Amino acid sequence: MIPLPGGVRVWLATGHTDMRKGFPGLSLQVQEVLRRDPLSGHLFCFRGRRGDLLKVIWHDGQGACLFAKRLERGRFLWPSPADGAVTISSAQLGYLLSGIDWRNPQLTWRPTSVG
């Protein structure tokens, strides 16, 4: 994952997003739905209807970046549409991108013996 500068917030756009959208469509959604500035330097994350595709837009001060990740199996865990815009930490974003439940990360495997 790309390291984020200090002070950068990560916003999740709740609900489903049309994943055919690129920079213009997602930037417009940031402005109209999230009521945020897409050029603010914060990350804005969007999930498709099936839940296996995630897009992130970020303006780094030099230009706009668009990242996409599709899970080979499973779905990205996402807040309900009633939650509105949700902010998460950069650590939670790392969990989210790994397909881990970012709301309650838990170790799923423990070694049974050493050596």
Stretches found by the model and what they are:
Residues 1-115:
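Polybasic/polar functional segments that serve as interface/processing modules
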